[in-house]
Amino acid sequence: MPKAMEGSSMFIVRTAILGIIISTIINAYLMTLPLPVLRKRDYMANYLIKRNNRIDIQNKRECAAFSTAYVLRHFGMEADGEELYTNFPNKMSSGNVYPKGIRRVLRKKGFKTNYYKGNLNTLKYEVSKGTPVIVFIKVHKDRNNLHFVPVVGYDKEYFYLSESLRHLVNCNDDNNSYNRKVPINEFKELWNVKNINMLLYSNTYITVHTIQS
């Protein structure tokens, strides 16, 4: 390879690497870095959070607020996703919200949150504790539109979600715990949100806990 072409190729590679590094730093500031957790723990083979709740349907890009409101109602606090979204922090110009925004709102309400990067086993373990877990997934597996939604149960075939996007609702539950079930293999594809600008955010989720007094 001529030296001029070799130099040009190296410049392109270095520029690409620098772009990835800068993007990762910006995302770490705007979104916070998820904490890796891979340790396998015991959990029930099937689990569903059976608590009467209300599943509201969003109209625009308010999934972060609607997911947060669902979790707040789980803890007995009346919350409306649309109202919550009005003053929701960490919004992008598009109206979408960074994960940090969800955590800020929940902490302000008196809860402890963690942002994890795990796998199917760690997600099931967290759900089996009895509190909805907010996952960061794609709306459709072949597109890059991203979405927050609470996971409220699982079994050997499906994950059960409290879905705020009307066109994704595909079932119903007597307790209003869930209105969407996703086959596990499909969920894995939706959960893989990784792209060149977001290398660290596949398989991430937010857990919520009450603060012990």
In which residue ranges do the predicted regions lie?
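Noncatalytic regulatory segments and standalone regulatory/sensor domains
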Residues: 13-14, 28-35, 92, 128, ...
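Active-site-adjacent structural segments surrounding the nucleophilic cysteine of cysteine proteases
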Residues: 11-94, 139-142, 155-157, 208-213
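Short, exposed beta-strand "edge-strand" segments with a Pro/Gly-rich flavor and a Y/T-containing core
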Residues: 73-79, 91-99, 111-118, 174-182
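N-terminal Lys/Arg-rich, disordered targeting/topogenic segments
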Residues: 1-8
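Active-site-adjacent substructure of cysteine-protease-like catalytic cores
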Residues: 112-170
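Stable alpha-helical elements in mature extracytoplasmic
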Residues: 59, 64-71, 80, 84, ...
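Structured segments of extracytoplasmic/periplasmic soluble domains
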Residues: 69-78, 87, 91, 105-112, ...
